Amino acid sequence: KTKKPNCIIIKPLAFEKMLCYNTVVLLKLQRKVNVMKNTLKKYLSLSIACALLISMIGCGTTSAPAETVPATESVTEQAAETVTETASAEETAAEEAIEAAETTYPVTLTDQAGREVTLEAEPETIVSGYYIPSSLLIALGLKDKMVGIEAKADKRAIYKLAAPDLIELPSVGTAKEFDLEGCAALSPDLVILPLKLKDAAASLTELGIPVLLVNPESQELLTEMIELVSTATNTQERANELLSYMASQKTMLSDILADVEPESVYLAGNSSLLSTAGPAMYQSSMIELAGGKNAAEEITDTYWAEISYEQLLAWDPAYIILASDADYTVDDVLNDENLKDCTAVKNGQVYQIPGDVEALDSPVPASILASVWLAGILHPEQVPADTYTTESNTYYETFYGISFEN
């Protein structure tokens, strides 16, 4: 019988994941484009060279004739040339991507209301009337360009921790009571508002102030908002780092939870236990990514829907998850006599989404961390509990400059 060669097999999928996760680490440690480019080049060259050498040396039999050595050396030389050519191609592609990512002004963009908005020059002063893009602007490194912000900024921990000066900025009100005159008086180069403020956007546009309307109410729309705002402000490089991190976490969860049985999850809103999010809302995709199934999947409302105790008991979820800013507590739910027969309550599976830095169940860029946290609750064997803590620390230190000791 012919002796089987001793082979070392590198699975393509595992190799791909390794490159993906290491890219995220590189993005965190190397923010300068030239450093990141050279690091990736060396990493790619070393990885390909190692893979080729392992496959040639590991798969060679002990009975191979000595005459094959020159051929191996020739192949190695060819492989080295290929590595060099590949690295050079990667370098060129990176440079072209960076050049293409820079915004050339004037630029005309289509916002999330379908409006065409033209910016004559890179914005130097920005007003955000919505906390979701406000958080994004900090992550994009634009906090020093902000001259106005939504009401109640002093209530948001993320501002106190990452950009305390924002708390002192003039308030432009809320979506319900927007201060149009106050916003216009700031003479900003760019204003970012929620979709529901279409009328205010029209009024500001008539005054010659560019306004972007955003509506990040799904994973796809959140990504679209990040791309829109970063293009408008010429911060695509930073946005790409942020999107790469988000994508790496989605990939991690999707791969790890691919074979799990989804758990039934009821998400309770801020104002009431009997207020919940249907499948049209961002929070539903957050549950699904964590390996859960939205108990309210039959609801057709596009906003928070009100239900009854009878309906909640009929769904009988395995888990009840409270919104991070809920006006009631986990103990309130566990001690609610109306829910004594609910599986989640009987088993003590009632939790609240973390909100000590910002509301992770809202469509902020950090909302990917809510899925990581929830996955640790629903599937602790696949996603250890400390995964959320580790990723949360990494995310906020990388994009907000916040370092947590505990």
Where are each of the predicted segments found?
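Proline-aspartate-enriched helix->loop->beta-strand connector
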Residues: V172-A175, L180-L193, I209, S308-D325
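Short, positively charged and aromatic/hydrophobic N-terminal segments
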Residues: I8-I9, A14-T23, K28-K32
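A short, structured surface patch at a secondary-structure boundary
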Residues: S128-L186, L190-K196, A295
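Alpha-helical, coiled-coil/dimerization segments enriched in small aliphatic residues
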Residues: T276-W304, S308
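Bacterial N-terminal signal peptides that target proteins for export
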Residues: K37-S47
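Bacterial lipoprotein signal-peptidase II cleavage site
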Residues: G58-T68
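Extracytoplasmic substrate-binding proteins
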Residues: E99, P106-L109, R115-T118, D199-S275, ...
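Hydrophobic core
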Residues: I48, L52-M56
